[in-house]
Amino acid sequence: MKIGIIGAMEPEVAILREQISNMETLSIAGCEFYRGELAGHDVILTRSGIGKVAASIATTILLDRYAPDCVINTGSAGGFDPELRVGDVVISDEVRHHDVNVTAFGYEPGQLPQQPAAFISDSKLIEVATQVMHQLPELQSRIGLICTGDQFMCDPDHIEQVRQTFPAMMAAEMEAAAIAQVCHQFKVPFVVIRSLSDIAGTESPSTFEEYLEVAAKNSSAMIVAMLKQL
């Protein structure tokens, strides 16, 4: 199986890259592509850069050049669900933009024209992630809504506004909805696996810096375990 894996930052891809054998590296438009074998699969690990535009560029190149059978987005996120803690893993059942608003024209909050309100994760990939959840009980994992915006969520007023608009939201980050939208348009299955580096709030910047490596380790462990099941 040919699998694309996308992470935004170096710490989010480094652990996985170390485990790839027979690796070839390609740089295009500021994106890094590492192709080789991981857990018996042909894997293209992609470092996209931060934010929705960077993620869209990287995902488009990945899908057009390598044509993977599915895409997994890895990395860190900020927690929104009060039951979640730093280091916990959130698996997307759907992904939405939280910083899009064209409701004046009858669209749902977060919905772009000519796009669905939510991008639905692949049921088979969710099923595999669910199996892995039981195999890795040391990782606290939940399945739910992940929302994306070109914003680091640390302003309390803004956090409350987003929470009211998307009450089911478990985690926020800066790339997943863009990746999901490109996958939707290419008709490629996807899922998002994110570990929490912080809980959205005023302490988020310092917590993020402290726990990014923990989040990267946990999300990478989940993905390697998933690859072994696919």
UniProtKB/Swiss-Prot annotation:
Catalytic activity entry: S-adenosyl-L-homocysteine + H2O = S-(5-deoxy-D-ribos-5-yl)-L-homocysteine + adenine; S-methyl-5'-thioadenosine + H2O = 5-(methylsulfanyl)-D-ribose + adenine; 5'-deoxyadenosine + H2O = 5-deoxy-D-ribose + adenine
Pathway: Amino-acid biosynthesis; L-methionine biosynthesis via salvage pathway; S-methyl-5-thio-alpha-D-ribose 1-phosphate from S-methyl-5'-thioadenosine (hydrolase route): step 1/2
Major enzyme class: hydrolase
Pfam families documented for this protein: PNP_UDP_1
Coiled coil: none
Keywords carried by this UniProt record: Amino-acid biosynthesis, Hydrolase, Methionine biosynthesis
Gene Ontology biological-process entries: L-methionine salvage from methylthioadenosine; L-methionine salvage from S-adenosylmethionine; nucleoside catabolic process
Entry EC no(s): 3.2.2.9
Binding site for substrate: G78, M153, M174, E175
Active site: E12, D198
GO cellular component term, pick one: cytosol
Gene3D superfamilies: Nucleoside phosphorylase domain (3.40.50.1580)
GO molecular function: adenosylhomocysteine nucleosidase activity; methylthioadenosine nucleosidase activity
Entries under InterPro entries matching the protein: MTA_SAH_Nsdase, Nucleoside_phosphorylase_d, Nucleoside_phosphorylase_sf
CDD domains (UniProt xref): MTAN
Function as written in the Swiss-Prot or TrEMBL entry: Catalyzes the irreversible cleavage of the glycosidic bond in both 5'-methylthioadenosine (MTA) and S-adenosylhomocysteine (SAH/AdoHcy) to adenine and the corresponding thioribose, 5'-methylthioribose and S-ribosylhomocysteine, respectively. Also cleaves 5'-deoxyadenosine, a toxic by-product of radical S-adenosylmethionine (SAM) enzymes, into 5-deoxyribose and adenine.
PANTHER family noted in UniProt: 5'-METHYLTHIOADENOSINE/S-ADENOSYLHOMOCYSTEINE NUCLEOSIDASE, 5'-METHYLTHIOADENOSINE_S-ADENOSYLHOMOCYSTEINE NUCLEOSIDASE
Family affiliation: Belongs to the PNP/UDP phosphorylase family. MtnN subfamily.
Protein name in the entry: 5'-methylthioadenosine/S-adenosylhomocysteine nucleosidase
Lineage start: Bacteria, Pseudomonadati, Pseudomonadota, Gammaproteobacteria, Aeromonadales
Gene name for this UniProt entry: mtnN
